Amino acid sequence: MALYIGVMSGTSLDGLDIALIEQSPALRLVATRYIPMPDTLRAELLGLCASGPDEIARSAIAQQHWVELAAQGINQLLQQQQLPPQDIRAIGSHGQTVRHEPSRGFTVQIGNPALLTELTGITVVSDFRSRDVAAGGQGAPLVPAFHEALFDQRPGNRAVLNVGGFSNLSLIETAKPVAGFDCGPGNVLLDAWIQAQRAENFDRNGQWAASGQVDPPLLQALLSDPFFATQGPKSTGREVFNLDWLQRHLRARGAIAAENVQATLLELTALTIVESLQSAQSDTQELLVCGGGAHNAALMGRLAALLPQTRVSSTAAYGVDPDWVEAMAFAWLAHCCLEGIAANRPSVTGARGLRVLGAIYPA
């Protein structure tokens, strides 16, 4: 039996998900802890997602704050479980993505793994994306191999959809290599718009979006972004889809009621997921949804309506809490790194071949 901890801080910037898993050899979720992102740290990290002055110093300060928060959560989880640090084989720390530009040959996740090792006394595996990018890949999404390991126990074809800040699909089909790609904005624009208009962190259950009406001209303008017509492998991030991007489209369109903008953004998320699934010519019988989007009743309902021949449900249908899938994935990726197991999938990222992912910081 080996215990690993996964730490995930996604593009939604709402907080840190920390998952303790057991790998023996089947994977089991043992315990979890969620640490909300302080507003000051969230602002620091958001500021690093766009060009600005003194980025190197600001990045160093922000990652110091990030890693202190992560270490606090990990140590609290160990205390809660009455586990000494030496019982944990490794921490898989994704860090916080502040830039992702694989077309230019780089991806940047900050998180100071050396300090995380010092603050926890546990070996840390981090920097999972850069090896795939160095091998010509997108460096994302990395979770399809984990989705395959976790959800390929039953016969039939299925897709696993993660809806965090951005949405990505993993296609798990009989006698085919796993496929996967980013679809586009997940919650990132929905969250940004409700924060700007109503000072709320997110649209609970999609209620505000459900109160509005889709604006067809705005929707078509948003869908005209070149990313959506790009064939995979592909990935995206806040460099492309952000509040400034949305506001440029809104200025071109004129006045639209705020709730109608939210309804249109939800439709954008749903349509780009469905169109991505259809363009992949996937013979999918079920769509399993994880991430924050699994709790958005309006989004789940829209996906079900657009995919009448597909069973749409949360990953909870497989006994896996949708909130913890990504943190579990990075714990699993740490296991793969220490065991020398290649965890990227060239069919997903476009890399030149299989690669062992991650850099190791021994305790």
Curated annotation (Swiss-Prot):
Name of the encoding gene: anmK
Domain of life: Bacteria
Lineage of producing organism: Bacteria, Pseudomonadati, Pseudomonadota, Gammaproteobacteria, Pseudomonadales
Tagged with keyword Heme: no
Family: Belongs to the anhydro-N-acetylmuramic acid kinase family.
Keywords: ATP-binding, Carbohydrate metabolism, Kinase, Nucleotide-binding, Transferase
Function: Catalyzes the specific phosphorylation of 1,6-anhydro-N-acetylmuramic acid (anhMurNAc) with the simultaneous cleavage of the 1,6-anhydro ring, generating MurNAc-6-P. Is required for the utilization of anhMurNAc either imported from the medium or derived from its own cell wall murein, and thus plays a role in cell wall recycling.
Residue ranges crossing the lipid bilayer per the database entry: none
Protein name: Anhydro-N-acetylmuramic acid kinase
An example Gene Ontology molecular-function term: ATP binding
UniProt binding sites for ATP: G10, T11, S12, L13, D14, G15, L16, D17
